[in-house]
Amino acid sequence: MYHPRELYPSLGAGYRLGPAQPGADSSFPPALAEGYRYPELDTPKLDCFLSGMEAAPRTLAAHPPLPLLPPAMGTEPAPSAPEALHSLPGVSLSLENRELWKEFSSVGTEMIITKAGRRMFPACRVSVTGLDPEARYLFLLDVIPVDGARYRWQGRCWEPSGKAEPRLPDRVYIHPDSPATGAHWMRQPVSFHRVKLTNSTLDPHGHLILHSMHKYQPRIHLVRAAQLCSQHWGGMASFRFPETTFISVTAYQNPRITQLKIAANPFAKGFRENGRNCKRERDARVKRKLRGPEPAATEACGSGDTPGGPCDSTLGGDIRESDPEQAPAPGEATAAPAPLCGGPSAEAYLLHPAAFHGAPSHLPTRSPSFPEAPDSGRSAPYSAAFLELPHGSGGSGYPAAPPAVPFAPHFLQGGPFPLPYTAPGGYLDVGSKPMY
């Protein structure tokens, strides 16, 4: 075991262990109690560490003035004026949307806080004057508690309901234009509309963390500094506006505040009368969801007086009923009645899109009467719908090219619907997997 004198020779020979104090802890044996005493750290023992520094003379005069540092962000200093603490002479800040804030303050402003973060409305929008046009400044904003009480909505007003929750971590919002010259800040109003409030203590995005049902007030800081992380502050000023006091909530408690937010917030126009998010539209959407999906309406297009429309056949193809006994000979063409609904069907196209682009020329030849397939030696597949293609040039039973105008049959899964083209032709299995 090393003696402290061996571990710290720089402390000098005067370093010694303190004597045992009366009434010491009896948990250590008397032989070891002396070895666990803290050394007496008087002034001579620290001279070896402070040899390069001279002791400042003690005088009764006041210390010379030092440059003021900004107060800790998130803490509320004791301002000398009701609204601002100045170390930037001649600088003034005014609230641009003061009338809007006053309208909300007369009712009792509430700000929604969420886990993901919610923007403030109204937002702090200020104008600054009196800055040095060439100097660079930072604009900061934090939110401080107004008092040490927790509030509760009593139906008509807010009333204190107990002691406030412990203080949350202090955070500061830095305006994205910082640092910028005084001319930049004075050119137009400065808006803090991107500030977000959250109630998540583990928020990783830097949003301002607040307690629900507590009263807060935004505070704006103007700091003269050349860099964002500069330690050389040239002065700062803090501004507060009594109209901006609000109570943080997770849901609006005062119905009048809800109406004001909808009427004044341009992003809440959907909640206004006849908007997409008004109560009437929300109730209608809920009813539609409870009813379930509505079945697709299919119109009966068999009436002859129906002029044209979704079921109007404009492709020139005819559809006839499939009757194996009355099937025509391969060289015989029989006129079929006009189709009841010969227009293209979106459902048929989704099931069998290949039928709308002509059959491929490599498909085997089948006759409409479901005989044994001579080319494959196996029986015809279940529920086949035959696609008969016109004869091509050169005497072949297959067309030389796909038809110029594709047909548009209505395929229904599980049933054959042959086409009135001359046989033989290709086929498609309607009951099989769609050919994409």
From Swiss-Prot:
GO molecular function (one): RNA polymerase II cis-regulatory region sequence-specific DNA binding
Basic and acidic residues bias locations: 274-284
Claim: Metal-binding is one of the keywords in the record: no
Compartments where located: Nucleus
DNA-binding region: 100-273
BP GO annotations: cell fate specification; positive regulation of DNA-templated transcription; regulation of transcription by RNA polymerase II
Region (Disordered): 274-339, 360-379
Start-end of Low complexity biased regions: 325-339
Keywords in alphabetical order: Developmental protein, DNA-binding, Nucleus, Transcription, Transcription regulation
Assigned GO CC terms: chromatin; nucleus
Description of how the protein assembles with itself and partners: Forms a dimeric complex with DNA (in vitro).
PANTHER family assigned: T-BOX PROTEIN-RELATED, T-BOX TRANSCRIPTION FACTOR TBX6
Reported function: T-box transcription factor that plays an essential role in the determination of the fate of axial stem cells: neural vs mesodermal. Acts in part by down-regulating, a specific enhancer (N1) of SOX2, to inhibit neural development. Seems to play also an essential role in left/right axis determination and acts through effects on Notch signaling around the node as well as through an effect on the morphology and motility of the nodal cilia.
Name listed for the protein in its UniProt record: T-box transcription factor TBX6
Species this protein is from: Gorilla gorilla gorilla
